């Protein structure tokens, strides 16, 4: 099992072709970027192999960074049933790796994540990317999937802060 003493949050943006990840920690009230990137599965010959790559990559991230919790965006419901099913299976592969590691997973609606970072649930991806860079004080530009994963992690840290401020559990 991974070391979970550092307060790192693993944000995930699962997809069947590209799964974004972002690791963020809070130190003395300041959010810090730990790592971010994208797991690409397009080189795999079939869909089950892609799911295996996602599971293994997330398990390796957990082992390497020892996050305390996981934050993931809720599945966007597509009009295309086959696409929605594949997205759900990719999400399941990522979350199974989290479950095996004993991590608690927190899911947020896309509008909640956008509201948490930008102040409106209807924000554009470019606005979210801008705020992720500002909040984490990083100049690096990330792929959209990694930015979405970082946004999920920051959202969860913001929600934890609000919970502490309100005195709720």
Curated annotation (Swiss-Prot):
GO terms for cellular component: cytoplasm; Holliday junction resolvase complex. It comes from the Bacteria. The active site is at 13, 73, 145. It catalyses: Endonucleolytic cleavage at a junction such as a reciprocal single-stranded crossover between two homologous DNA duplexes (Holliday junction). Binds 2 Mg(2+) ion per subunit. GO terms for molecular function: crossover junction DNA endonuclease activity; DNA binding; magnesium ion binding. It is an enzyme of class 3 (hydrolase). Mg(2+) 2 binds at residue 73. Its cofactor is Mg(2+). PANTHER family: CROSSOVER JUNCTION ENDODEOXYRIBONUCLEASE RUVC. Belongs to the RuvC family. This is Crossover junction endodeoxyribonuclease RuvC. It comes from Solidesulfovibrio magneticus (strain ATCC 700980 / DSM 13731 / RS-1) (Desulfovibrio magneticus).
């Amino acid at each position: 099992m991974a070391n979970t003493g550092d307060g790192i949050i693993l944000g995930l943006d699962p997809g069947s072709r590209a799964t974004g990840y972002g690791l963020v920690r809070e130190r003395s009230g300041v959010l810090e970027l730990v790592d971010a990137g994208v797991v690409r599965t397009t080189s795999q010959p079939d869909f089950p192999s892609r799911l295996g790559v996602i599971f293994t990559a997330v398990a390796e991230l957990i082992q390497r960074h020892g996050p305390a919790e996981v934050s993931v965006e809720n599945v966007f419901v597509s009009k295309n049933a086959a696409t929605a099913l594949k997205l759900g299976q990719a999400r399941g592969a990522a979350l199974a790796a989290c479950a095996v590691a004993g991590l608690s997973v927190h899911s947020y609606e896309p509008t909640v994540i956008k509201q948490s970072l930008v102040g409106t649930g209807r924000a554009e991806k470019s606005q979210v990317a801008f705020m992720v860079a500002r909040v984490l004080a990083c100049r690096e530009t990330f792929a959209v999937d990694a930015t979405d994963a970082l946004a999920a992690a920051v959202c969860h840290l913001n929600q934890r802060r609000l919970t502490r401020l309100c005195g709720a559990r």
